[in-house]
């Protein structure tokens, strides 16, 4: 099979049967789908683990088992570790849950790292990286070489086209009469009527294919628009491929394929849905709609992405490069999640075992210390319910502001490399808790 060498950028990374689909933007401007064989893994550690039980579990879960070692996160010592390599990316989560049930969460390491991030750490191909790849005509990557660093300032990248999909009017569409759908690309607005049914869906697909945007921005796309479109398409049995159809190097050049591709899903261009969730943060119950992502094309719900609203596409590109999280997922996460991903990547490169669950207890604090210092002294949690005459103190970006103005971070408090500096306010033991500002 003829080999091909290409230069370009890693547009997106997603799991496929037996490996990862790498959507690649060539220097010529083509977006093609490549395939990289890859099997993610997780580790089990602990003196109580029995080899016979581990091998039996690996056989049941169809995982490859190997003995190795790693650096313990807490002690810094090198300890034995057992590596479970799963058959494919989709089986990582189920296998980890089985291992947690069988051996306990304290035995698991490197188990909460997404396949995409594991792939980036193993190969160096991170989202939006510039790379040279050597692949077969069917898209199977044989070798790859990264040509830049995620830390490069103002790293060059291709221009990205954007289209907007929304309903007419303002406000949440679920709270008013259903209005026509608007598709805006290249400054031109097209209106589509829901009552046209199957023709409405086919026209939407035609508009998306003709504009071929790299980024499809929606308003309320995750919690209302895309679920409604998918439900309508399912009821009318009309395909709704809003993502890109996988095209291999052979497809682009016009050459015949020599064998079936392993790229993508059984339904090319399909919309991939996730899980919705609710959580409590500082006394507020927050709902996060299920993410709806596209293959080979980015989908960002402007109403479900704090980062997109604050930084736009350039900010998402930068954070995706730095964190190793694919852009569609980083758009729906917090800056803290991206920072954690950067820390995990650093640990993996250093051979440090990342605990599955946090198990390092905090230093003891008395009741008085907790009142003064815990959560900055803010210990009041509002009673759930409807209230009137409510006042709110909004500390926008409080923690980043403290880090920026006063250089406060885990690396600068009680560090061993500097003399004690300014005492941290309100901490009782001021001799031992200091901020070192010389970093």
Kindly give the residue locations of the regions a language model identified:
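The two-metal-ion catalytic cores of nucleic-acid processing enzymes
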Residues: 1-391, 395-396, 400-432
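Positively charged, low-complexity/disordered segments
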Residues: 434-439
């Amino acid at each position: 099979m003829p080999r091909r060498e290409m230069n370009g950028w890693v547009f997106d990374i997603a799991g496929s049967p037996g490996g990862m689909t790498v959507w690649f933007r060539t220097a010529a401007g083509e977006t093609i789908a490549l395939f990289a064989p890859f099997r993610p893994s997780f580790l089990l550690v602990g003196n109580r683990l029995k080899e016979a039980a581990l091998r039996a579990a690996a056989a049941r879960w169809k995982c490859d088992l190997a003995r190795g070692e790693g650096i313990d996160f807490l002690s810094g010592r090198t300890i034995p570790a057992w590596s479970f390599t799963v058959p494919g990316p989709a089986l990582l989560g189920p296998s980890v849950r089985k291992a947690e049930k069988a051996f306990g969460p304290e035995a698991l390491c490197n188990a909460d790292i997404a396949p995409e991030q594991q792939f980036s750490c193993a190969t160096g191909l991170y989202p939006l990286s510039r790379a040279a790849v050597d692949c077969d005509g069917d898209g199977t990557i044989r070798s790859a070489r990264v040509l830049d660093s995620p830390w490069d300032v103002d790293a060059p990248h291709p221009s990205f086209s954007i289209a907007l999909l929304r309903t007419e009017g303002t406000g949440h569409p679920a709270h008013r009469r259903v209005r026509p759908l608007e598709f805006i690309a290249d400054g031109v607005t097209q209106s589509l009527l829901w009552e046209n049914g199957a023709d409405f869906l086919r026209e939407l697909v035609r508009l998306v294919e003709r504009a071929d945007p790299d980024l499809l921005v929606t308003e309320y796309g995750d919690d209302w628009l895309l679920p409604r479109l998918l439900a309508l398409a399912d009821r009318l049995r009309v395909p709704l491929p809003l993502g890109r159809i996988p095209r291999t190097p052979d497809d682009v050049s016009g050459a015949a394929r020599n064998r079936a591709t392993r790229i993508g899903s059984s339904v090319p261009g399909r919309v991939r849905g996730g899980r919705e969730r609710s959580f409590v943060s500082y006394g507020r119950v927050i709902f996060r709609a299920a993410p709806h992502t596209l293959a080979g094309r980015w989908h960002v719900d402007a109403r479900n992405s704090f980062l997109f609203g604050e930084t736009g596409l350039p900010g998402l590109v930068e954070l995706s490069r730095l964190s190793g999280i694919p852009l569609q997922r980083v758009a729906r996460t917090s800056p803290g999640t991206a920072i954690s991903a950067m820390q995990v990547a650093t640990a993996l490169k250093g051979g440090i075992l990342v605990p599955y669950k946090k198990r390092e207890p905090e230093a003891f604090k008395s009741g008085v210390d907790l009142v003064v210092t815990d959560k900055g002294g803010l210990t009041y949690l509002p009673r759930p319910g409807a209230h009137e005459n409510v006042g709110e103190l909004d500390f926008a970006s409080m923690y980043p502001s403290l880090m920026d103005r006063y250089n406060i971070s885990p690396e600068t408090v009680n560090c061993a490399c500097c003399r004690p500096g300014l005492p941290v306010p309100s901490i009782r033991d001021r001799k031992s808790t200091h901020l070192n500002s010389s970093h």
